[in-house]
Regions:
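Extracytoplasmic/periplasmic
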Residues: 731-746
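Accessory, non-ATPase domains that flank or precede helicase/AAA+ motor cores in DNA-metabolism machines
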Residues: 1-440, 447, 452-468, 782, ...
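Short helix-capping segments at alpha-helix termini
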Residues: 353, 588, 747-753, 803-804
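Short beta-strand elements
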Residues: 593-594, 747-766, 807-815
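Generic structural signal for residues in well-ordered beta-strands
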Residues: 178, 257, 357, 475, ...
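Residues at beta-strand starts and edge strands
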Residues: 5, 20, 38, 330, ...
Length: 819
């Protein structure tokens, strides 16, 4: 059989159920440009609709009857190299996504194409009308096309004609009255400005313009200016010489000057940053730095947990590691969990590395992200700093990845592909023979376990950098506050501490923990929270049916009005930051108060925090974004308004997250030369997690938590795969989820899976059962994250999509989901 020059293409239109590399012929006219990593337009499916794709590889294959050819090359050069393509293929196998979904995650949004379907007349209008006789609705389409000049975007046709456009369009295309083409347009174009320079040497330019200096003074002024300034933007030449654009064009025609285009990069600006002082490490920091640097120098893959108490100076260690990594001729990535932390960290790193640092996160303008990507790709950047998406920056010769606050759930994507940045970072370090550093005061239980087992290295920072003691912590019992006649949001101990700070001119941070607040029941007298008898997680209250439900195993029971432990009244817990702010203003009418929460814009976060630091505003109130990473030397008091809310949510990580959050927020106090204090308000003052956090005792928390995880087969002792079914009809979704559970149980009996002792739980409603008018039910598979399990789940997802009984419903798989 005859072989042909072909390419394997990842096609954007292919859903996960049929996703694979598709073979396409390479026309001779496109042969030179059809290389791996460029995007193409290809016909796809029975209707040969044009779709975007990415060339994965070029091969010689048998030319089969009906083979299709690529139609258009979209990129002048590859947007992904082999390493990027390999990463996309790895993500497909790991995170149950298509190759093209992985590609879109890796590339900046500014590189994406928008596809437009353009319908055009294939003949003269009158001829078209004659040919369209007998086609219902054809004349309305033809009238509209004539008004649009003979062609129109499908969206224009649908807006005008509604659903009635589809049938006549298809019929007229079949009759060759109309043609349909797909136009691809980049979402963001490169920006450039027009430059001007002399096209002849200076002496000749003066010789040509000096004689006409009186009659054409502008020409002489242009020559005089360019002779001094050299190549200059055309707008500046006009501004300084008064020459019009017409004058410049005349000079170009005369051969005096030449125009050219120069790229203009749109880079996010920072205020002027002063050079940073010399970094001096203490003995503990120096030891940790030398240990990790040795692994960077060894050029072998490694993972190190840098476990340091809050305020121990992990950032100084990061800076020194990056300095030495760059001295070795390598590059570095530094990841932070929250966008709000990026500008503060960026200023620190810019003070040492200047313009060789690039910042990447989702709140940058699309144009800025795209231009930062270009700088990185060209090798103009040595250090990339940003949130989890910064992992996909095309850095060459990577030597170091630092993941600060590695315990944060924001390192796990909630959108397809549902990737875990920690896993992607480990993949990159293996590929690049680089060192990975997980930095945290409260590492995840899985990370601490891996270090304990010797799978990761470990470096410890047990003391604060400034030698200050950790903050003194007072636990305020909210049950007693109610009994004492104070039902408000600010307890008496916290109010008294705030008064002390106001009198001393020191600052305070108040943290409101809002996660899960609207779904929690709690006894206001004894602190009892209803828990699932099987899963040891708090149950979620559903107001629609007045029941409590476990979102792991599906256990359900009526929600009681009174506490089964003490007979007290059960109450819904949760208040917003605005309500807290109102109470604060009543208590302290003269005090300045700033509020930062999810309603604050991304740029507003930074502005508020800078105002808090610069103007020493007495009180900062906020949610998650004030809990970590912030470093203000005049903050001596931290108040946690409700410690219980994140502790009693239906997630196996609830205790870990609460301990981490409390430890982090308490650690914001006393970071300058003054002693810090903290007040933790709670309905359950005897809870071990809250007591451990108050003592900043990670070891005690870890020992307790690891015992519970082992008993319940939670990570790291097993993996949890969440299989979610969604659709618009709740009954159908629930029946499909029951069917999925039975299929899973049958599949898990296979020998290659049974060895991992898999267990299938559910179905149960998702924590938020209805989103965008779609109901969601899920099963949980407890087992091993190995190749056999992933292949089985991939098959299940594809089989579900192919079954016509499941039309209108979706199934997706998540691994150790954050929620």
């Amino acid at each position: 059989m005859e072989t042909a020059d072909m390419v394997k293409v990842a096609v954007s239109a292919a859903p996960y159920s049929i996703d694979k590399p598709y073979s396409y012929l390479v026309p001779e006219s496109l042969a030179a440009a059809a290389v791996p990593g460029v995007r193409v337009m290809v016909p796809f499916g029975r209707g040969n609709k044009e779709s975007e794709g990415l060339i994965l590889t070029r091969v010689q294959e048998p030319k089969l009857p009906g083979s299709k050819a690529i139609r258009q090359i979209l990129d002048p050069e590859p947007v992904l190299d082999k390493a990027g393509i390999d990463l996309a293929l790895w993500m497909r196998g790991r995170y149950f996504c298509t190759v093209f979904e992985a590609v879109k995650t890796i590339l900046p949004a500014g590189l994406w194409y928008g596809l437009r379907e353009i319908w055009s007349l294939a003949m003269e209008p009158e001829t078209a009308r004659s040919a369209a006789v007998g086609i219902p609705g054809a004349w309305q389409v033809l009238d509209l096309l004539e008004k649009q000049g003979g062609k129109a975007d499908i969206r224009v046709l649908r807006d005008a004609l509604g659903d009635g456009a589809e049938k006549p369009l298809k019929a007229m295309k079949k009759a060759e009255i109309l043609t349909c083409e797909t136009d691809a347009k980049r979402k963001i174009a490169d920006k450039s400005h027009r430059m001007v320079e002399l096209a002849v040497n200076t002496e000749d330019a003066y010789a040509l313009t000096e004689p006409k200096r009186r009659s054409a003074p502008a020409r002489y002024e242009v020559v005089n200016f360019l002779a001094t300034a050299g190549r200059t933007p055309a707008a500046e030449v006009s501004y300084y010489t008064g020459a019009s654009s017409r004058t410049l064009k005349t000079m170009e025609k005369a051969g005096l000057i030449a125009f050219s285009e120069e790229e203009e990069l749109r880079v996010p600006s920072l205020d002027d940053v002063e050079p940073g002082p010399e970094i001096v490490l203490n003995e503990e920091q120096q030891r940790a730095f030398e240990e990790i640097l040795g692994r960077v120098q060894a050029a072998k893959p490694s993972v190190t947990l840098l476990h340091g108490v809050t305020g121990s100076g992990k950032t100084q260690v990061y800076l020194r590691l990056v300095q030495e990594t760059l001295a070795l001729g390598k590059t570095a990535m530094v990841l932070v969990p929250e966008i709000v932390l990026t500008p503060q960290m960026m200023r620190k790193f810019s003070s040492y590395f200047g313009s060789r640092v690039a910042m990447l996160h989702s709140s940058l303008k699309m144009t800025e992200r795209y231009d930062q990507w270009k700088r990185i790709r060209r090798g103009e950047v040595d250090v990339v700093l940003g949130t989890r998406s910064a992992l996909f920056a095309p850095l060459k010769n990577l030597g170091l990845i630092i993941m600060d606050e590695e315990q944060e759930g924001s390192y796990q994507s909630e959108n397809v592909p549902r990737y875990d940045a920690r896993e992607v970072a480990k993949y990159l370090c293996v590929r690049e023979k680089a060192a990975l550093v997980f930095g945290s005061a409260t590492p995840t239980v899985e990370t601490a376990w891996a270090a304990e087992q010797g799978n990761y290295q470990k470096a410890l920072l047990r003391r604060r950098y400034n030698e200050n003691a950790l903050p003194e912590v007072l636990i305020a019992d909210l049950r007693q506050e109610i009994l004492n006649g104070n039902p408000g949001l600010i307890s008496t101990p916290l109010r008294q501490e705030l008064e002390k700070n106001l009198a001393a001119g020191e600052q305070s941070i108040l943290f409101l923990n809002r996660r899960g607040s609207s779904r929690m029941l709690l006894c206001g007298e004894c602190g009892y929270v209803p828990q699932c008898p099987r899963c040891s997680t708090a149950m979620t209250y559903h107001s629609a049916n007045g029941r409590l439900m476990c979102h792991y195993c599906g256990h359900s029971e009526p929600a009681a009005d009174t506490c089964p432990e003490c007979g007290g009244w059960m109450k819904h817990v949760g208040a917003g930051t605005q309500k807290v702010e109102e109470e604060l203003r009543e208590l302290f009418p003269e005090a300045g108060i700033l509020r930062v929460d999810a309603d604050t814009t991304a740029g507003g976060h930074e502005e508020i925090l800078q105002t808090f630091e610069r103007e020493r505003v007495p009180i900062l109130l906020g949610t998650q974004m004030v809990a970590k990473g912030l470093d203000f030397e005049n903050v001596t008091l931290v108040g946690v308004l409700s410690a219980d809310i994140s502790l009693y949510v239906d997630n196996y990580r609830a205790a870990e997250r609460t301990f981490s959050l409390l430890t982090q927020v308490v650690g914001r106090a006393g970071r300058g030369g003054k002693t810090g204090r903290a007040v933790i308000q709670t309905y359950t003052p005897g809870n071990d997690v809250i007591r451990c956090a108050a003592r900043q005792d990670y070891d005690a928390f870890y020992e307790s938590e690891i015992r519970m995880r082992r008993l319940r087969r939670y990570p790291p002792f097993a993996d949890l795969f969440t299989v979610t079914v969604s659709g618009t009809e709740e009954g159908r979704v629930l029946r499909a989820a029951v069917s999925v559970r039975e299929t899973l149980r049958q599949l898990c009996r296979r020998p290659e899976l049974a060895a991992g002792e898999p267990e299938v739980l559910g179905p149960a409603p998702a924590p938020v059962v209805k989103v965008n008018n779609r109901f969601r039910y899920r099963c949980t598979l407890v087992g091993k994250n190995d190749k056999a399990t992933r292949e089985m789940l991939a098959w299940l997802q594809k089989d579900f999509a192919k079954d016509s009984a499941n039309r209108g419903m979706n199934l997706f798989v998540d691994h150790n989901a954050a929620d």
